[in-house]
Structure formats: C-alpha cells, structure tokens
UniProtKB/Swiss-Prot annotation:
The keyword Transmembrane applies. Heme binds at C510. Its main location: membrane. One of its GO terms (molecular function) is heme binding. Keywords: Glycoprotein, Iron, Membrane, Metal-binding, Monooxygenase, Oxidoreductase, Transmembrane, Transmembrane helix. The gene is P450. The lineage of its organism: Eukaryota, Fungi, Dikarya, Ascomycota, Pezizomycotina. It is found in: Membrane. This is Grayanic acid biosynthesis cluster cytochrome P450 monooxygenase.
C-alpha cells in the first residue's frame, strides 16, 4: 500500500515535468523544421525562442535593432543545395519565432499600405496594457473604426482653429524659459519641449493641460518617470499577456515595488480618473452630441475651443461600448504619451542642429524677418510660417504636405520611431522577391492568446531608421545638410522622400502629425528669434539615436540638450 502511495506521489510530481519537456521538445521541432517560417534565413536560436530578442533588449540596452542589421549582413547570401548556388537572402531574416524582418526600401510601401487588412503584433500591442487605445488595438477592423473617430480632429482646418491655443502655450513656455534663464542656470530643452508638447495635447484632448510647463525645473521628475515608463512597457512585451493588466489593477504600492517606473503610470491614473469622472458627469447634463450646452463642466466652458474627448464621449458615430470610461482613459493616456515624446525629440534635435551650425541659424533667422521683423513683433500666423521655404518648404507629391527642409532632415536622422514597424497581413500572403510570406489570422484582440500557437500569426516588420540612413539615397546620412533638400527637381525630391518615414505610413501611420507639425512651426521660430541660445555641456550624442525605447532615445547617460538663455540680438 505504501509503495502504491509513493508511486502515485512520484507520478504526480514527474508527470507535469515530463509533459512540459515533451511540449517544449515538440515546439522546438515545429519552430525549427515544420513552421511555415522555417524556410526563412536567420539564427536558429531566434527561431526557437523570443529569449534571443529579449536578451538584446533587456541586457544590451534595447539594441536589438542594430543586431537585426547585423543579421541582414550575416545572412546576405545563402547556399541553396537544390540549385547548387548562392541566393541573396539578406533583405529578409527571421528575427523571432513569429516574425520576419525585411530590409528593402521598395517593400516598405507594400507593408505599410492602405490596401488590405493589417493586424498589429499582439506582443507589441500589449506592452502598455492599453488595448482600448488606437496604438494598442490589434484587430484591423476595430482599429479602423477607432481611428476614423479620431482623425477628423487632426485635419488642417481643425488645427488652424486651434492656433490660438498653441500660440498661448508657445508664449507661456517662452516666458518660463526667460524667467529660468535669469537664474543663470542652463535650460534643459528636452524637458522644456516635452512639457510644452504634453500641455498642448492635454489642452486639446480635454481642456486641461496639466500645467507641466509651470512646474519647477520643467517637471523633471515627471519627465524621468515617463521615460522609465516607456522602458517598463518595452520590458513587458516579453512577459505573459496577463502580467500588465494584473499589475495595473494592483494597489499603487505593489506597482511601485515591482517596477519603480510604475510610478509614472500611477500619476497618470490619478489624473485621468479625476478627469473622466468630470467628463462623464458633464455628459449627463444634456443630450448626446450637444456638449456645448452642458453647464457643469467649467473647464470646457472656459477653454473656448472644441476638445477631442468631450466630442468622442458624445459622438453619435461610436457605439456605447467604444465610449466607456476604461477605453477612453486608455486612449487619452496613449495620445498624451505619444504626443509629448515624439514632438519634443524633433524640437530638441532641431534647436541643437541650429546652434551647432551658426550659418544655418543665420539663414533661418534672415528668412523669419519677413514675418517677424524684430524680437518684439507679434507672432506670425501658422499659414504665414507654412509659406516659408527654408523652414517649411512643401514637399511635392507627399503625404507630408507641410514638412520643411530643415525639419524633415532632423526628423529623418534623429527622431521618430526607432522601433520596428510590425504588421500582420491578416487576409492574404505577401510576396517579397522569390519568398512567399504566409498570412496571419483574423481574430478579435480580446481572444488572441499571447502564448498562442505558431500558426496564429505571421509578423512582418521593417525598421524605418534603416531606410532613413541609407547612404545610397542620402550620401553622408548623419551629416546636417539642409542644402540636400534645396533646388531639387520633382524626380530628385521624390527619391529623397521615398525613404522618409519617421512617422510610419498606411493605416497605422501617425494620427497626430498635423498637430505635431503646427507645434514645431510655431515654437521653433519663437525660440530662435526671442532668445540667443548657447549650448552648454551638450553634443551631437545627446540627440543621436542610441536606445530603442519605443521612440528613439539618446545614450543612457545623456542629460539632454542644455542651453544658456541670453537676450535676443535678432
């Protein structure tokens, strides 16, 4: 009897271990030899497990994107036994069990097309635990519906109507910079511009900016927390899908003890919860779609402009489930986070390049005199600034209708998303050279398991920065050369524009590009005409890409671009 009991105990102990070992062995065999992706070149360890990728992300300072570039070179030619010849396979490499990465500038527009259904990689989508937001939406059809509700707010006419709000934020930031400069301490442009961009987005979203630009040291603690929050999200993509929702639902002290970066999420939760209690209370005061008649939302009444989320929660075009508090909070958080980070990168890099190249700054100032005769002149209108060729020369035949020569150059080399643009071709296979890339599956985002079977998805990705530093298109690509964009015929300009994709393209392209451009065109002329700025303890490495923290980030020890502020000689 005792022997039977001991045997049963041993069976209970060893059976799960044996089952796990068999499952692991079977999964390894499938991924290496039987998977539809097994035929594609790439390291076997990457095909076997995502731990290969996570090693470079977690332990090599988020530098998997450069490792991928090395893999393309390593697998540039492969011997094909059937034909006894070498085939050029470098442009396509398997970088994890589910994903193929392609390095070919002509394929980018096939992968980022408006045609067909494109799901998002579930591993990337769940990293910030905001499946209700546009950026966290996996399913193509749901994403299209949510994006369609947001896009009208970023039309050129809507941005022109917001011009006075942006100008008010520009004036406030310049006042803060002037006051800070009087202390004799250098201003951190990265933090200051991030406060400005976040305040603009907050004001447009819900008539409450948050007042980051008013805080001492330009909210340096909040800015550091936000950066750490982005990195925490990147780490989360390698954890089970249930991890982030559980952590976000836990008490604040537990979140902070698990990851100090969770403090950033906690701050945002408190602000957004309070905000949406106010919004939904206001919603009860009047009929759907008639926000202007509600009298108990004093922030909206005082704002004097339409706001995105007041309109969204009362939109007759969205079903009730799309207007729930939880989803709208997630949408707001994603929008503020994305709008502040990316715009501040462009502003910081642009101002640094101007200060490091006095001849370019001098030429820009000379052009600005046509609309700003002196430092005390009234601010020009956005339309006036958009007409300046050196600052904002319209690019022909481009969706970037108002991306200027200088801004374009900065955006291409030093800003935008450094992370891979990942797409799941849901309804059809893709074809690249002689390769057939199998389609993914159609599945609702709520029931796609993160540890799904390998047939559940085929992720196809490209890294935009590889296109933007292609020396065949841009000789000496890291040099600050505005003249490369001047005096071009249409064919030459189109060739340069083809690789210019800092904000992505297609159905998943940046929704807020028009707002971001308006912020840039209005703030940068103000900075270079109202002040004489002098670099302090800063160099090019403080703006160059070094770390993939979703957006590009400079080296980890960078303190940002700092400047001394002096009275303008403009």
């Amino acid at each position: 009897m005792l022997g039977v009991i001991q045997y049963s105990i041993l069976t209970i102990f060893w059976l799960p271990i044996a089952a796990a070992x068999l499952y692991g062995a079977g999964l390894a065999i499938y991924r290496l030899f039987l998977s539809p992706l097994a035929k594609f070149p790439g390291p076997k360890l990457a095909a076997l497990t995502r731990k290969y990728e996570s090693y470079y992300e977690a332990y090599q300072n988020y530098e998997y994107y450069w490792k991928i570039k090395e893999l393309h070179k390593q697998y540039g030619e492969l011997f094909t036994p059937l034909t006894a010849s070498f085939x050029r396979x470098g442009p396509i490499v398997r970088v994890n069990p589910h994903e193929l990465h392609i390095d070919d500038k002509d394929f980018y527009y096939k992968l980022n097309s408006f045609q067909g259904a494109w799901n998002k990689d579930p591993y990337t989508a769940h990293q910030f635990a905001n499946p209700g937001s546009i950026v966290g939406t996996i399913d193509h059809d749901i994403h299209r519906k949510r994006r369609a509700a947001i896009m009208p707010f970023f039309s050129k006419q809507k941005i022109y109507a917001l011009e006075s709000v942006i100008q008010g934020m520009v004036d406030k930031l310049c006042y803060r910079i002037e006051e800070y400069g009087k202390t004799g301490q250098p201003v951190n442009l990265r933090n200051a511009s991030k406060c400005f961009a976040a305040d603009v987005v907050g004001e447009y979203c819900f008539a409450e900016s948050g007042g980051l630009x008013d805080k001492p040291d330009f909210a340096i603690e909040e800015m550091n927390q936000q950066q750490q929050g982005l990195k925490a999200g990147l780490r989360a993509r390698y954890l089970p899908s249930w991890w982030m929702p559980v952590v976000r639902g836990a008490p604040a002290w537990i979140r902070a003890s698990i990851d100090p970066a969770a403090k950033h999420f906690e701050v945002w939760h408190r602000v957004s919860d309070s905000l949406f209690v106010r919004l939904y209370d206001a919603r009860k005061x009047g009929p759907v779609g008639r926000m202007e008649k509600r009298k108990n939302d004093e922030f909206y009444e005082k704002a004097g402009h339409r706001t995105i989320f007041h309109e969204l929660i009362n939109s007759p075009h969205l079903p009730p489930e799309e207007k729930g508090t939880g989803r709208i909070i997630q949408e707001a958080g994603a929008m503020v986070g994305a709008g502040g980070e990316s715009t501040s990168q462009v502003i910081t890099a642009f101002v640094y390049c101007l200060l490091a190249n006095p001849q370019v700054l001098s030429r820009l100032r000379e052009e600005l005199r046509s609309v700003i005769p002196n430092a005390d002149s009234p601010a020009p209108t956005l339309r006036q600034l958009e007409a300046l060729p050196y600052l904002v020369g319209p690019l022909l035949x481009s969706t970037y209708k108002y991306v200027g020569y200088l801004l374009t150059l900065v955006a291409r080399l030093r800003t935008g998303k450094i992370a891979r643009h990942q797409r799941v071709p849901r309804d059809r296979p893709l074809y690249f050279n002689e390769w057939e890339i199998p389609a993914g599956v159609s599945x609702h985002e709520d029931n796609i398991p993160m540890a799904s079977t390998d047939t559940a998805q085929t992720i196809c990705s490209m890294t935009p920065i590889f296109l933007q530093i292609d020396p065949e298109v841009y000789p000496n690509p890291h040099a600050f050369m505005p003249e490369r964009w001047l005096n071009l015929d249409e064919x030459q300009r189109q060739r340069l524009e083809h690789n210019l994709v800092p904000y992505s393209k297609g159905t998943r392209g940046c929704a807020g590009l028009t707002l971001a451009n308006a912020e840039l065109y209005m703030l940068i002329p103000a900075l270079v005409t109202r002040f004489d700025l002098e670099l302090f303890d800063s160099d090019a490495w403080d703006t160059e890409m070094a770390v993939d923290s979703h957006h590009h980030s400079p080296r980890p020890d960078s303190k940002g671009v700092k400047v001394f502020v002096k009275k303008s000689t403009f």
